[in-house]
Design a protein with these regions (language model features):
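Helix-loop junctions at membrane interfaces in 12-TM secondary transporters
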Residues: 160-173, 184
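Intracellular loop-helix junctions on the cytosolic face of multi-pass helical membrane proteins
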Residues: 1-101, 105-110, 255, 260-268
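Residue-level signature of mid-helix packing/kink "hotspots" within the transmembrane helices
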Residues: 122-130, 181, 223
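Transmembrane alpha-helical segments of major facilitator superfamily
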Residues: 34, 116-125, 218, 263
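Transmembrane alpha-helix termini and helix-breaking/packing motifs in multi-pass membrane transporters
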Residues: 8-25, 223-249
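Structural signature of the two symmetry-related core transmembrane helices
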Residues: 143-158
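Helix-to-loop junctions at the C-terminal end of transmembrane segments
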Residues: 17, 127-141
Length: 268
């Protein structure tokens, strides 16, 4: 139910902004509305949720010195892998979320195509996540994530041949949704596997540190990527006006295509 609400709000955002004038004030108003709703939902979740599972191993780990817990974390090679996967997943989400609007406007010719691309990518993703279980049992989480990452990269590279056809770009977005579904569907269970592996290898269960570090990695990746995108757009001469100079349009196209390829190449 929440996913359907997310789809509808994402698809409706740009049309609503355009109907409200399409200027900075319209963006601020819509963002403010979403922010108020988000704060309310977060507070609801915080005050309405109670953790009922607390293993003895986790309790004992919390009593250990920080140096011991961080040592167990660093010596867990799979933690570093999942950390980088989480970080560059955030890189992809930032690139796609930031640049896709400009790609729709300056490459496809209408910024409302962003809503179409968003739906085209997210609907297949959710469908695939819902049916992942039997494939995980047969092929394993790692193999599915690798196959999905390769599929996403290959699909994105086809945009080099046909970058400005809305139907083709939407089809590529749908394939991206299928490709990224295994990682989105498995990332948190893979973190749990990392916790169990670390406990087996070191005798120290540091689940709080692992999940916290992965979350920090996501925030760091998204923040740094956003700053880099801003710098590159500025250097290209991007102004945000209805008409952009060729260098700015080329930067939008390159970021949209190669940013995704780069992120998923690192994940692999």
């Amino acid at each position: 139910e929440f996913r359907r609400v997310l789809f509808r709000s994402s698809a409706a955002s740009l049309p609503i902004i355009n109907r409200m004038g399409g200027d900075q004030a319209a963006w601020i108003k819509v963002t403010l509305i979403y922010s108020v709703v988000a704060i309310g939902l977060l507070l609801w979740g915080f005050f309405g949720t109670k953790e009922r599972v607390n293993t003895q191993a986790a309790q004992e780990a919390e009593k250990l010195p920080a140096s011991v817990r961080f040592g167990a974390l660093i010596h867990n090679k799979y933690f570093l892998m999942i950390l980088f996967a989480s970080l560059f997943l955030a890189v992809y989400q930032t690139v796609n979320g930031t640049v896709a609007t400009y790609y729709a406007q300056y490459i496809l010719g209408n910024n409302e195509y962003y809503s179409v691309l968003n739906l085209a990518e997210n609907i297949p993703q959710v469908v695939v996540i819902m049916i992942l279980a039997p494939f995980i049992k047969k092929f394993g989480k790692r193999n599915l994530v690798l196959a999905g990452a390769i599929l996403t990269m290959v699909a994105q590279l086809t945009l080099l041949a046909v970058p400005a056809n809305p139907a083709f770009v939407a089809a590529v977005a749908a394939i991206r949704g299928i490709g990224k579904a295994p990682l989105f569907g498995c990332v948190f269970t893979m973190m749990a596997d990392v916790v169990n592996y670390g406990h087996w290898k070191t005798g120290v269960r540091v689940q709080a540190l692992i999940f916290s570090a992965a979350t920090v990695g996501q925030k760091f990746g998204g923040g740094i990527t956003g700053a880099i995108i801003g710098q590159l757009m500025d250097k290209s001469g991007f102004t945000g006006l209805a008409q952009e100079i060729p260098s700015a349009v080329a930067m939008v196209e390159n970021l949209y295509i190669w940013g995704t390829v780069f992120a998923w190449a690192i994940i692999i």
